[in-house]
């Protein structure tokens, strides 16, 4: 890929703007509307919060000055927020965001449900879970002690992530100085970036943005080593998706030197993949394959952010470029409207990051037409999951659908940033794209092809022995 600067214009972060005084609302008296069930993984996740901690979704909306999930969705979709959304200053923003995590990790009590003699206080070790009294904390300690250390990292990362949103944290970039085949995991990637990486991190640690970030939080700034580790984890979280796509290309030996460029589809894309996405976020994919003639990455899903919605071009790409675009639709509908009509080229690879079809009948129903389409058209497909348990469950679904599994296992480019299960804080944190599965076509069809290749041709001509 041709070298170019990563210092581009950054999109505005969510508003931190003056707003009218709004009196505190009793969340128990006014219950903001929750979304209707559907194929949106964002909506399903939001609904699930209420089953784990009754009243938590309403608490989140209330602290963000919102009346419904639709208003919340409008913000994470990149749309224009309602007038009531906003914060007087950065300090208030962090305070209100932290308020959305305030519930007793043991008895699940929310602030409005506490008696006057109780108050929620956080664990002093991790600063990430809350308890309404010492008895709940003691009762919860056997479970919490197993994850307290990791949750401390989560709490730091949650603050540091704001530097990505504001654009103050610019990831090191540029053509790889090492041979691509030498970069097999994060250790080799970090070694390759070497001095460039350390220079970037040290400059940010000493920056005014870092100072103001922790000053607005009103709590002590962690040691430099802690912040350094957090920045590296955040970096892997951003780069995990493009490098995991590269893993799929390597595994399937896809030709990236195809005239006109290669087409990659990210299906089931949500705000996780598309919110505040920037044009250079997938440049690392191009550097992974310096011989590429261009990558066209199209994100398809009902939760694709408005920032990414744009028409995808079928025109040939400039060699070494990565073009990002998005379509808000279910993939099988997108296929009928764009691929079958010839508007867009067939994909060289389809990827689904955490599709979750194993988790609920509703998601499986939404995913089934897409999975069958990918199988029947023999489209090279990569999916990722959070855990070994999800890997096994997803493999079982794919085996039941008679897909031909090519490879699966631990992802060498998994995110190193631990993710807290929002409404179950003592559940073991997970890591994005920790495991992967690659499949193509139908398993029984592959067996049939193999048998045909092994059987002798009944109509082959056998030459007579001249002797």
From Swiss-Prot:
UniProt keyword terms in alphabetical order: Metal-binding, Zinc, Zinc-finger
Region (Disordered): 1-34
Bias (Pro residues) ranges: 14-23
GO molecular function terms attached to this record: zinc ion binding
Chain positions of all zinc fingers (MYND-type): 104-148
Binding annotation for Zn(2+) 1: 104, 107, 132, 136
Positions with biased composition (Basic residues): 1-13
Binding site for Zn(2+) 2: 123, 126, 144, 148
InterPro entries: Mito_gene_expr_regulator, Mss51-like_C, Znf_MYND
The protein, known as: Putative protein MSS51 homolog, mitochondrial
Organism: Rattus norvegicus
Gene: Mss51
């Amino acid at each position: 890929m041709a070298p170019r600067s990563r210092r581009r214009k950054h999109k505005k972060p969510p508003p931190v703007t003056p707003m009218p005084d709004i009196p505190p609302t009793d969340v128990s008296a006014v219950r903001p509307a929750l979304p209707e069930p559907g194929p949106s993984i964002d909506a399903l996740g939001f609904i699930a919060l209420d089953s784990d901690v009754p009243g938590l979704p309403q608490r989140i909306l209330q602290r963000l000055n919102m009346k419904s999930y639709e208003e919340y969705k409008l913000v994470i979709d990149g749309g224009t927020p309602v007038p009531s959304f906003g914060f007087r200053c950065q300090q208030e923003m962090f305070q209100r965001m932290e308020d959305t995590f305030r519930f007793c990790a043991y008895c699940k009590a929310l602030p409005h449900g506490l008696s006057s003699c109780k108050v929620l206080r956080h664990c002093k070790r991790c600063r990430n879970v809350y308890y309404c009294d010492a008895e709940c904390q003691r009762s919860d300690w056997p479970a919490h002690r197993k994850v307290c250390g990791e949750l401390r990292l989560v709490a730091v990362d949650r603050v540091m992530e704001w530097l990505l949103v504001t654009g103050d944290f610019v990831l090191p970039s540029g053509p790889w100085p090492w041979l691509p085949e030498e970069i097999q995991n994060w250790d080799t990637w970090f070694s390759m970036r070497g001095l460039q990486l350390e220079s970037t991190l040290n400059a940010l640690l000493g920056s005014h943005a870092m100072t103001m970030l922790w000053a607005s939080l009103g709590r002590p700034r962690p040691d430099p080593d802690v912040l350094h580790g957090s920045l590296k984890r955040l970096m892997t979280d951003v780069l995990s998706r493009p490098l995991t796509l590269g893993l799929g290309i390597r595994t399937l030996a896809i030709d990236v030197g195809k005239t006109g460029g290669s087409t990659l589809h990210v299906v089931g894309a949500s705000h996780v993949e598309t919110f505040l996405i920037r044009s250079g976020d997938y440049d690392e994919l191009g550097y992974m394959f310096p011989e590429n003639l261009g990558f066209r990455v199209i994100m398809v899903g009902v939760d694709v952010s408005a920032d990414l919605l744009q028409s995808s071009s079928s025109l040939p790409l400039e060699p070494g470029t990565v073009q990002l675009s998005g379509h808000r639709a279910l993939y099988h509908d997108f296929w009928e409207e764009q691929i079958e009509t010839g508007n867009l080229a067939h994909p060289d690879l389809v990827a689904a990051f955490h599709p979750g079809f194993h988790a609920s009948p509703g998601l499986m129903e939404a995913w089934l037409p897409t999975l069958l389409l990918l199988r029947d058209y023999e489209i090279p497909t990569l999916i990722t999951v959070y855990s070994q348990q999800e890997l096994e469950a997803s493999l079982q679904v794919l085996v039941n659908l008679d897909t031909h599994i090519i490879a699966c296992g631990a992802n060498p480019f998994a995110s190193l940033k631990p993710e807290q299960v929002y409404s179950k804080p003592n559940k073991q944190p997970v890591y994005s794209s920790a495991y992967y599965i690659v499949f193509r076509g139908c398993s029984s069809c592959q067996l049939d092809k193999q048998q045909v290749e092994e059987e002798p041709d009944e109509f082959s001509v056998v030459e007579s022995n001249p002797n």
